[in-house]
Amino acid sequence: MKLIILLFVVAAFVTLAMGKKSLKDPLTITTAHFDHPEGLKHKIRRPYNKHEDRLIQCKIYL
């Protein structure tokens, strides 16, 4: 019985440790361009195909 309880406690600690690593820290400062590709502005949506991708690249260049 003690072995089963010990096993559950160890499993709980392992789960807690893995969960802490996978969660993002809410207090970190992120920029306005967080998770955006470089050069891509907020108002420009992601392209549907390679032709739209090329058009967006031209707009960014100009």
UniProtKB/Swiss-Prot annotation:
Keywords: Signal. The lineage of its organism: Viruses, Viruses incertae sedis, Naldaviricetes, Lefavirales, Baculoviridae. It comes from the Viruses. Residues 1-19 form the signal peptide. Pfam families: DUF5437 (PF17505). This is Uncharacterized 7.2 kDa protein in HE65-PK2 intergenic region.
